[in-house]
A protein has these predicted regions:
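Short beta->alpha connector loops at strand-helix junctions that form conserved
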Residues: 40, 450-452, 471-474, 562, ...
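Conserved alpha/beta-domain cores
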Residues: 92, 519, 529-877
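Flexible inter-domain linker/hinge segments
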Residues: 210, 379-411, 525-531, 535-540, ...
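Extended, non-globular alpha-helical segments
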Residues: 396-436, 487-525
């Protein structure tokens, strides 16, 4: 019989694939002797089985779970569902990768009217009675919300109404009698919403709760988070069942969340929050704003001293910063969870360097422990120092996720999406965020919440996304119904500007200028380590000297893609280019192109100068001509006048350029075949610029790489290459200099990959244009795929957007085939990638595996690619 259930005493940290992260760490803490309430874990395989069985828990799994309950009863001396000495449990999810706020928790399971009455009868203390009713109403509320999907808001409204009637501000101020009434109201609300009574049998409660955790693996929030974080659907989640310890028992109890180092800065100091007389959910959900962890020392000196020891033990054991949840019940400490803590990119770099300096990690291990995707956030804007000095903060919350944000106020995630789609920059202002808000949080420049601490949902999710966040600004008076809030006497309506500083927590009215980030010393240190290990070169996609300069600062070793068409759109050149398009004869076309030549030459010269002898790959004209022609009446008239043609004639030419499927139309090398004069002009510009820069800097190795786009047949490449080589050689001879250059091609049509052995005979290099290669392989266009991709995610046909994360099974197979066919024919062939995928870590890893020479990505993703390339090389060892 298969083992579906493991006691905490039966597992360890190596079993996270089976027990999930939380279960494996609870087992590990048990094995090193830390105070963990002893329970059991239902495996991730049971979750997969649940889905295979049509979303049902089979009898075998349930029977093993009940055996686990019996073991818990033995260890704890209490009985599940017993009236005299009841065992109450918590049910929590735990996937193998941490997914904050995505999966749901149920506390105090096992309570019903009889158990509650018996518990109170056995202990006449009024404080105990209050505790029992508090635990009961929490259980009904959580069970209804998480297991039965009755919205939390119905219960929150009842609590708010009760507090109003009693004239109190906090839940803790409600009496036992108030909470007893609330529990009755909650059960009535449950029946009203679902048409059946609240389940009173603890075994039924447990089964429903386990099913709910498994079910939540497939909730929309979990699916979005998984897609953003490369977590496969097939992993499933485990379920952890453990005896309750009560932080809300009395004033000798409490609950907290802590980090062994500061998750925002990485500084080596204990950082966290503690709430007296509360349950864990209160801290994480951010309903009450807690006190800093250091204050716990005054309240519970013995438990605090033990906790400090536990922190040291865990950090020395895991060799990484730990995020821990704990409860104190009657002054006794219990550990409920530990995991490697989520951290900002700044903190990740500092912690990695410190762990190397402290002897916990090697350089290679330090490089491997940083998530490359988070490096993006280091390059985030900060407020301009002078503008900041002149501004006065209106209020202050907690600086929960660094960076500076400025935008228009919106009050719901839906509004954030609508406004952002119109190109507006928005700041999402909420009482507190919940996992349902994730889509709005993703598009916002920043997030501001009234409630919640540094470990609330808003804070954790914002840090993960690299979005600026200020949480827990209790001075804000919120009026969600009318979409406005008041702070320091000033009213902010939807659409008003606000600026927030996620580092200091300051909130400002109006707009404050932001500036690009400065990169700290640890960044350079970690990047130097990464460069030591990686084998892949990293280039950038850049069309302007400014982009190229930025990319060089971030460590780019060349330009892997310069798109020449962007240079045609500038005011002074577009007119000449339009004349070329509307010309009738080769001579007319050549005359128009002659006007553009000096501009192109100047552009290339500036790029060569910015790269100081590092390689520059220049892609010849790619888009279809209709993209360049005028659409406005005035522009059409201007063009007609310049060419001495009638407006009618010009309009006819424009109409003739219309294509039904321009993506597969008259573009790329097809333009150079029909209009070789375009390729001639571009070649002259490339070679003349190179000669000029070579003369000025004889110590640089200026070697142009000319790239012919959209080749699908070797004869096309031969034809265009002949034009390029004849033109280039004539230019070099005329100048009386020596200059080496290369002619290569983009591999972006499946047929090019399939016939790469033929094409390699004519090409000096291949560069995979994976944006087009993905479109052509899947047969859907990048601009239209958005209409149906969401349905594909919902139905699990796709788990990822193939335009963001390289499809390794299909597109990847074509790439591998092209390399295997091309290299034997032309051993000198060098191969790169220049689609958007060049900056995606999992795609970079794949490129390393199949033997590419370089990846090329946008300037700000260069550090991501450098780190991902190093991690791929380290993992291979």
């Amino acid at each position: 019989m298969k083992k579906w259930v493991y006691l905490f005493s039966e597992g360890d940290m190596t079993m996270r694939n089976l027990l999930g992260g939380k279960g494996a760490n609870l087992a590990e803490m048990t094995s090193i002797g830390l105070p963990v309430p002893q329970g059991f874990t239902i495996t991730t395989e049971a979750c997969t089985q649940y889905y295979e069985d049509g979303r049902k828990i089979n009898d075998e799994i349930m029977a093993q779970a009940m055996e686990g309950v019996a073991e818990m009863e033995k260890i704890n001396g209490k009985k599940f569902g017993d009236l005299k000495n009841p065992l109450l449990v918590s049910v929590r999810s735990g996937a193998r990768a941490s997914m904050p706020g995505m999966m749901d928790t149920i506390l105090n399971l096992g309570l019903n009217d009889e158990v509650v009455a018996a518990m109170i009868a056995g202990n006449p203390d009024p404080a105990f009675e209050r505790f029992v009713y508090d635990s009961y109403r929490r259980f009904i509320q959580m069970f209804s919300d998480v297991v039965m999907e009755v919205g939390k808001k119905y219960f929150e409204q009842l609590i708010d109404k009760m507090k109003e009637e009693k004239g109190v501000k906090y839940d803790v101020d409600l009496t036992a009698a108030d909470l007893k009434v609330l529990a009755e109201q909650f059960k009535a609300e449950y029946k009203n919403q679902l048409g059946k009574d609240f389940p009173s049998d603890p075994v039924e409660q447990l089964k429903l709760a386990i099913e709910a955790v498994f079910r939540s693996w497939d909730n929309p929030r979990a699916n979005v988070y998984r897609r953003d974080n490369d977590i496969p659907y097939s992993w499933g989640t485990a379920v952890n069942v453990m005896p309750m310890v009560f932080g809300n028992l009395n004033n000798e109890s409490g609950t907290g969340v802590a980090f062994t180092r500061d998750p925002a800065t990485g500084e080596k100091k204990l950082m966290g929050e503690f709430l007296k007389n509360a349950q864990g959910e209160d801290v994480v959900a951010g309903v009450r704003t807690p006190m800093p962890i250091a204050q716990m020392e005054q309240e519970f000196p013995e438990a605090y001293a033990e906790f400090i020891k536990v922190c040291e033990t865990l950090e020395n054991h895991y060799h990484d910063m730990q995020d821990m949840e704990f409860t104190v019940e009657n002054k006794k400490l219990y550990m409920l969870q530990c995991r490697n803590g989520k951290r900002t990119a700044q903190a990740a770099l500092k912690i990695a360097c410190d762990l190397v300096d402290e002897g916990h990690k090697t350089e290679a291990e330090a490089v491997a422990m940083i998530d490359p995707r988070n490096l993006d956030t280091l390059l985030h804007p900060q407020f301009d120092a002078a503008a900041l000095k002149a501004a006065t903060p209106l209020g202050k919350g907690l600086g929960a996720s660094p960076g500076a944000a400025c935008g228009k106020v919106v009050f719901t995630a839906e509004d954030a999406e609508v406004w952002a789609a119109k190109g507006e920059k928005v700041v999402l202002v909420r009482l507190e965020t919940s996992p349902e808000d994730i889509t709005g949080m993703k598009v916002a420049q920043g997030i501001l919440t009234v409630r919640g601490g540094m470990t609330s949902h808003a804070a954790v999710v914002a840090r993960g996304m690299g979005t600026c966040c200020v949480s827990g600004c209790g001075e804000i008076a919120m009026d969600e119904a009318n979409k406005k809030f008041t702070l320091a006497g000033q009213v902010f309506n939807e659409g008003d500007y606000i600026s927030i500083d996620g580092t200091t927590g300051n909130i400002y009215a109006g707009q404050i200028k932001t500036v690009d980030a400065q990169i700290a010393g640890e960044f350079g240190r970690v990047m130097a380590w990464a460069d030591k290990y990686r084998k892949l070169k990293v280039r950038t996609n850049a069309d302007t000297p400014a982009d190229a300069k930025k990319a060089r600062e971030l460590g780019a070793e060349g330009i892997g893609l310069c798109r020449t068409e962007h240079m045609f759109f500038e005011e002074d050149r577009i007119a000449a280019f339009r004349e070329m398009i509307c010309s009738d004869t080769v001579e007319e076309r050549e005359a128009a192109l002659e006007k553009i030549l000096p501009y192109q030459q100047g552009d290339f010269k500036a790029l060569y100068e910015a790269l100081e002898g590092n390689p520059v790959t220049i892609r010849f004209l790619d888009p279809p001509l209709h993209e360049f022609v005028p659409t406005e009446e005035a522009d059409i008239e201007k063009l007609a006048k310049a060419q001495g043609k009638s407006v009618e004639t010009i309009k006819n030419i424009i109409a003739s350029l219309h294509e039904f499927n321009p993506m597969m139309g008259h573009r790329g090398c097809r333009l150079a075949v029909t209009y070789p004069e375009i390729a001639k002009m571009q070649t002259k510009a490339v070679i003349r610029a190179a000669i000029e820069v070579q003369k000025a800097h004889p110590d640089w190795n200026v070697k142009p790489e000319i790239m012919i786009p959209l080749v699908c047949e070797v004869k096309e490449l031969k034809f265009v290459k002949k034009v390029v080589v004849e033109t280039a050689d004539a230019e070099i001879a005329a100048a009386g200099v020596k200059l080496e250059y290369e002619v290569g091609t983009m591999i972006e049509i499946p047929r090019a990959a399939l016939t790469a052995d033929e094409i390699a005979k004519e090409a000096d290099f291949f560069c995979f244009g994976t944006n087009d290669l993905t479109q052509m392989t899947f047969g859907f266009s990048r601009d239209d795929a958005g209409k149906f991709l969401n349905a594909y995610y919902d139905t699990k046909i796709f788990e990822n957007d193939p335009f963001a994360k390289l499809d390794q099974t299909g597109v990847g197979k074509l790439m591998e085939m092209a390399i295997k066919l091309g290299k034997p024919v032309n051993p000198k062939l060098h191969v790169g990638i220049c689609g958007e995928h060049g900056g995606d870590p999992s795609s970079v890893e794949f490129c390393h595996k199949i033997g590419l020479d370089y990846v090329s990505c946008s300037p700000f993703r260069v550090p991501i690619a450098r780190l991902a390339a190093a991690q791929a090389a380290i993992a291979e060892k």
